[in-house]
UniProtKB/Swiss-Prot annotation:
Function: Catalyzes the reductive methylation of 2'-deoxyuridine-5'-monophosphate (dUMP) to 2'-deoxythymidine-5'-monophosphate (dTMP) while utilizing 5,10-methylenetetrahydrofolate (mTHF) as the methyl donor and reductant in the reaction, yielding dihydrofolate (DHF) as a by-product. This enzymatic reaction provides an intracellular de novo source of dTMP, an essential precursor for DNA biosynthesis.
Source species taxonomy: Bacteria, Pseudomonadati, Pseudomonadota, Alphaproteobacteria, Hyphomicrobiales
Stretches of the chain forming a coiled coil according to its record: none
Protein family (similarity comment): Belongs to the thymidylate synthase family. Bacterial-type ThyA subfamily.
Positions contributing to (6R)-5,10-methylene-5,6,7,8-tetrahydrofolate binding: 51, 169, 263
Bridged cysteine pairs (disulfide): none
Record-linked HAMAP family: Thymidy_synth_bact
Name listed for the protein in its UniProt record: Thymidylate synthase
Listed EC numbers: 2.1.1.45
Compartment(s) of residence: Cytoplasm
Protein species of origin: Mesorhizobium japonicum (strain LMG 29417 / CECT 9101 / MAFF 303099)
Keyword set includes Amino-acid biosynthesis: no
EC top class named in words: transferase
Superkingdom to which the source organism belongs: Bacteria
Amino acid sequence: MRQYLDLLQHVLDNGADRSDRTGTGTRSVFGYQMRFDLARGFPVTTTKKLHLKSIIHELLWFLAGDTNIKYLTDHGVTIWDEWADENGDLGPVYGRQWRSWPDGHGGSIDQIAGLLKEIRRNPQSRRLIVSAWNPAEVEAMALPPCHCLFQFYVSEGRLSCQLYQRSADIFLGVPFNIASYALLTLMVAQVTGLKPGDFVHTLGDAHLYSNHFEQAREQLQRTPRALPTMWINPEVKDLFAFRFEDFRLENYVADASIQAPIAV
């Protein structure tokens, strides 16, 4: 996945050194875009192995509208543990905003259901958008949304997705985000009868934490391999009916993972 390695190199070479909320320090650029043709393979890093189990379960958890880590914990996924309270709650994070955005009148808006309806009804629409950034609730979230808005686009029977990510931890977070939204695009394409198009990833503050520099340089010494393919159970036609067992990454050959500390 050369696009991702180019991002690592660009930030190392051109980024500005900055302080940050966690006190760790970062090297950062503002504004960067990558594009992945999903017909050419599933965009997952081959220069370090990713934990696909966590990515799939997290996406299913988002789509369920869940904001408590119990489901993740029950399935051995720990990526949200640092931010949960003693009851496992995270506040009104992604799942709530995607599926139950308060409408101001005592009800809620299911953005995902509305998105699917609009893709089927009016695929040329320029309003195929889901936002997780709710200013009225952002202060109550354990972690404000980093990947905060995405838009779908249909052309010639192909479904593309563009994600805007306001804050991008490019060593630990971005590979997960690429795989997660690529998978979401494949799932939405399947249930709406479309073919997968491109995944476009637009980054706002794209940063390497200072304690990830050496790990990034190590990864840049590795040679990317051919991308794997993601098999999705073709029998599933309801986005909310997918289960972990409905996905299988095939022909995934990757170098060993590279450990790096997470900034909380």
